[in-house]
């Protein structure tokens, strides 16, 4: 049975909405899934795009899936009372790798400290970022929006990676994941209400949130990913930009 990683945030609800596949589902925050995939404890998982790039010689990608946004994403936020041009320290979450590097790309002069320490701004991701937007009146800066304003491209936060040697059945699993996303898109109200019951956010809020998320790994997303990796390399966060290697040749999403 395929060991399938699942990010333990509400952003996975569309992907697992009606997943028709026999899998062992293993949940964790992004950095935990990164570690477990590279340790051989998972057969496929959505992992931080920067961690894929750092380990691309050991991994292959599902060609039709990612987690991205075209502009604002809501669940990746810099919270700061200071204007961004005046931010010199950022307290960063231990749960994300891509967002931390994206912060370095967007704010190259800011030093990073662990979340909880005194800083000009703090980086929140996932459900913590969504909750903060409800509860904290401090200005929030959406990293997906900031990225698009800088590059004009989508920001790919995660890719679906598989360690070599590859487990059998991955192409069929990708088909099932894509089918689940398509059904979720066709039933947005039901998706939002079910996710509201599971995660506690208002259904209307989740419906708007899910509209901002993208799961197809098309040409624009790949261009956005490669641009991010090139800028990460310039920032000293990546030794080299890898060629993308896939489980199989891409088919229309």
State each model region's role:
Residues 1-20, 27, 73-120, 124-128, ...:
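Bilobed "Venus flytrap"/periplasmic-binding protein-like clamshell domains
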Residues 7-11, 29-31, 41-52, 58, ...:
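Beta->alpha turn/N-cap motifs
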Residues 37-38, 232:
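Hydrophobic residues within well-ordered alpha-helices
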Residues 66-69, 119:
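Phosphate-rich cofactor/ligand-interacting catalytic cores and adjacent structured alpha/beta frameworks
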Residues 68-77, 135-164, 205, 209-212, ...:
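Periplasmic-binding protein-like
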Residues 112-195:
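Pocket-lining segment of extracytoplasmic ligand-binding domains
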Residues 167-231:
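Secondary-structure end/capping motifs
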